[in-house]
Amino acid sequence: MLKFLKQVGDYAKEAVQAGRYIGQGLSVTFDHMRRRPVTVQYPYEKLIPGERFRGRIHYEFDKCIACEVCVRVCPINLPVVDWEFDKATKKKKLNHYSIDFGVCIFCGNCVEYCPTNCLSMTEEYELATYDRHELNYDSVALGRLPYKVTDDPMVTPLRELVYLPKGVLDPHDLPANAPRAGARPEDLVEKTEA
């Protein structure tokens, strides 16, 4: 009889412990359900890249002196610089410049060491294509004006954690009516219907 009571007592303790574990898990779940979503509705809302973001390289053909410093400092010798020596002016004449962004590691060395500042990093990060050969940008494609998220009228630019009031570090301790980073899908539907 004593052995049976001990088994019942052990079973009760284990049941209470299991209930505690389930309660702890559910408390975490309910805590996350109470929080606001921080999802950004990507095609319609985009986060503004940071100040030192290294995106697509912008190239200014007129400033380039074909010194090939960018090729020498590139860890993978990526930029292709085609030039010829002009005997009349005794200077290099640039014929062609290209970078394959399918191979580029966006380290920024070419931009940093360029003596004429003809290369610069942009905010563009949407370089996806269906064919990898389309990522090989020549001097014309590299020279097109850089795209800025803030200039696109079809996109709502968002700064990361821009909705946090001053002094608040935790994005989950906000009042319910505070502006948020990403709009809920139902809010987007209401905007289009209105």
Curated annotation (Swiss-Prot):
It is a peripheral membrane protein. One of its GO terms (biological process) is photosynthesis, light reaction. Binds 2 [4Fe-4S] clusters per subunit. Its EC number is 7.1.1.-. Residues 174-194 are annotated as: Disordered. It catalyses: a plastoquinone + NADH + (n+1) H(+)(in) = a plastoquinol + NAD(+) + n H(+)(out); a plastoquinone + NADPH + (n+1) H(+)(in) = a plastoquinol + NADP(+) + n H(+)(out). InterPro entries: 4Fe4S_Fe-S-bd, 4Fe4S_Fe_S_CS, NADH_quinone_OxRdtase_chainI, NDHI. Its cofactor is [4Fe-4S] cluster. NDH-1 is composed of at least 11 different subunits. NDH-1 shuttles electrons from an unknown electron donor, via FMN and iron-sulfur (Fe-S) centers, to quinones in the respiratory and/or the photosynthetic chain. The immediate electron acceptor for the enzyme in this species is believed to be plastoquinone. Couples the redox reaction to proton translocation, and thus conserves the redox energy in a proton gradient. This is NAD(P)H-quinone oxidoreductase subunit I.
